[in-house]
Each structure stands twice: as structure tokens, then as C-alpha cells.
């Protein structure tokens, strides 16, 4: 007699928040054979209805407590608004769930440091979606720099200005644009420098007389002497007839330079080193959430 049995080795996950980012994660996990999306939770009835249509094999719930209390759920994906994230991370740790979180990890800097302390004092795995480290263009540029092609790394300049969300269009819980989108560039600049920030100065503009700065420029130094400047804002011509944006990375060494620009569809990398001059033009690649999910599964 032949006896066959199959064991589901996929990672069981509950998605909390089925808005734009939650759906990105659902799509990436659905395309992978490594994830079992057991639950989808959202407090909005329309989002739950959409989840039922898109994911008939998942349990669709309004109360996330059901996900946390299910001992078979190994991972929670926290993709709601920032003001609820700290409480959800705290609950995930209490119930022994690994964590994939959107940024920012809380609604204020004080709460963010509390979350950092909580996650560092547990043996659970937690990650935040700072996807630029997984992008092909940044990895290409960093590899070129490590080959010594531009000499000693000296200056890192990053700019990302888009029309983006104006105040009142859904960004209030995440705080000023720099507190959310800007963290990508704070992170990737530090990644290039390879050490912690030492000094910084910043200025902001309260566009449209809004209470928070919607444009910020920050510059300073790293502990190894590398200098940086970061410019970020959702202020770039919201009412233009034909909207545009300005996004670039410009890294200067003692002997050469590397730079990148993109239009959200195509990224162009120019590498000007002592031995090679290379130009690479490829699809931008989006948010690389599939890469994040695979790396998390590997962990």
C-alpha cells in the first residue's frame, strides 16, 4: 500500500491593513510559494469586501485580535496607519509573532524609540520596509564604489522631490513627508557611508502655511568624515498641467563619481571610474517587496 502525505511548509502570515501597501504585500506573497496568507484584517468594510474577492482562501476579519490569538500564525504584516503601529508591534511581541512593518514604525519619534527598544529585546525577527537597499541600481553603484573605481568615498547627495500627497490627502498619520518617505534616503545614505551619522543641520519649508514642513533639506557628516545632503519633499508642482519630479543620487569620490536618476519607470545609472565608464538603463523595479518577503522568509 502506498501512503502519501503532504505537509504545508509555507510560512503562515496574517496581513493587518489591506490598503495600498497591504495589497502590495498580498500580491508579492501570493506570487511566492513560501507564504500561506491565513488572514487578512481591515476595519474598512470596502477593503474587507475587496479582500474576500481577491483572496477567497484567506479568512477575512475586522478584529486583528483573532490573528494574534491564532498560535499557528507565525508572522504578522503591519500595514495600517502609523498611529496604530506601536500598539500592534507591542501586541505581536506579546503573542510571539515575527513582524514585517511598514514605515514609520510609530507616529512620533518618542514612540519610535520605544518600538526599537521593544524589538531589540526579543528573539523575534522584525523588519521595516526600507526597500532601496534591495534595488538593483543602489547595489550596482555600491559594488562599483567598493571596487575602488571612484577612490575614497567623500560626498553623498540625494534628492527626491515629487508632487506626492499634499496635506489633507491621507498622509497625516505618518507625519511630515520626511518622517515617512524621507527615511528611505536617511537609511540608504547611511548604507553607503557604512557608519553612523555624526552631525547634521536641517531646514524645512511649511508649504501652503501647513503646520508641518512638507519639504526638508538636511546636510551633515558621518563618523568617517563622509559628508551628505538629503533633499526630500512632496511639494513639486502638485497643480502643474503635466506633473514631473526630480529624483537623483550623486556620489562623489576622490577619483570618480557614480550617479543615478529615475522616472519611476526607468532608472539610469552612470558610473565614471578610473578604469571603467559604464551606463546602465533598466526598468526601475518598484518597491522590491518580493525581495523583502523572500529575505524575511530566508531568515
Feature annotation, model-predicted:
Residues 1-55:
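N-terminal Rossmann-like dinucleotide-binding module
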Residues 1-10, 75-80, 223, 295-299:
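C-terminal helix-rich "cap/oligomerization" subdomain common to oxidoreductases
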Residues 25, 55-118:
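Beta-loop-alpha module in the N-terminal Rossmann-like domain of NAD(P)-dependent dehydrogenases
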Residues 83, 106-167:
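A contiguous active-site-proximal alpha/beta segment in oxidoreductase catalytic domains
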Residues 101, 126-128, 157, 230, ...:
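Hydrophobic residues in well-ordered beta-strands that form the structural core
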Residues 129-137, 160, 164-201, 209-215, ...:
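Mid-domain beta-loop-alpha active-site segment that forms a flexible
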Residues 186-266, 290-299:
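Contiguous beta-strand/loop segments that form the cofactor/metal-binding neighborhood of enzyme cores
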Residues 275-299:
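C-terminal helical cap and adjacent loop that interface with cofactors, partners, or active-site loops
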Amino acid at each position: 500500500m502506498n501512503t502519501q502525505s503532504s505537509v504545508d511548509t509555507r510560512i503562515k502570515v496574517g496581513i493587518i491593513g489591506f490598503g495600498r501597501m497591504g495589497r502590495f504585500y498580498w500580491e508579492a506573497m501570493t506570487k511566492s510559494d513560501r507564504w500561506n496568507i491565513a488572514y487578512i484584517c481591515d476595519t474598512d468594510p470596502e477593503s474587507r469586501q475587496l479582500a474576500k474577492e481577491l483572496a477567497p482562501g484567506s479568512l477575512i476579519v475586522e478584529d486583528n485580535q483573532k490573528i494574534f490569538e491564532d498560535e499557528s500564525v507565525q508572522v504578522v504584516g503591519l500595514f495600517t496607519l502609523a498611529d496604530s503601529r506601536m500598539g500592534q508591534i507591542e501586541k505581536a511581541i506579546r503573542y510571539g509573532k515575527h513582524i514585517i512593518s511598514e514605515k514609520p514604525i510609530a507616529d512620533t519619534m518618542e514612540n519610535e524609540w520605544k518600538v526599537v527598544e521593544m524589538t531589540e529585546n526579543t528573539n523575534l525577527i522584525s523588519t521595516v520596509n526600507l526597500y532601496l537597499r534591495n534595488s538593483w541600481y543602489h547595489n550596482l553603484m555600491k559594488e562599483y564604489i567598493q571596487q575602488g573605481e571612484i577612490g575614497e568615498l567623500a560626498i553623498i547627495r540625494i534628492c527626491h522631490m515629487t508632487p506626492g500627497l499634499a496635506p489633507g490627502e491621507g498622509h497625516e498619520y505618518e507625519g511630515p513627508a520626511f518622517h515617512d518617505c524621507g527615511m528611505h534616503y536617511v537609511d540608504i545614505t547611511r548604507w553607503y557611508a557604512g557608519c553612523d551619522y555624526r552631525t547634521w543641520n536641517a531646514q524645512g519649508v511649511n508649504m501652503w502655511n501647513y503646520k508641518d514642513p512638507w519639504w526638508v533639506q538636511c546636510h551633515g557628516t558621518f563618523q568617517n568624515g563622509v559628508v551628505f545632503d538629503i533633499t526630500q519633499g512632496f511639494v513639486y508642482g502638485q497643480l502643474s498641467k503635466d506633473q514631473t519630479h526630480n529624483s537623483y543620487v550623486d556620489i562623489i569620490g576622490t577619483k570618480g563619481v557614480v550617479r543615478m536618476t529615475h522616472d519611476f519607470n526607468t532608472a539610469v545609472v552612470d558610473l565614471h571610474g578610473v578604469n571603467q565608464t559604464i551606463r546602465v538603463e533598466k526598468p526601475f523595479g518598484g518597491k522590491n517587496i518580493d525581495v523583502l518577503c523572500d529575505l524575511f522568509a530566508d531568515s
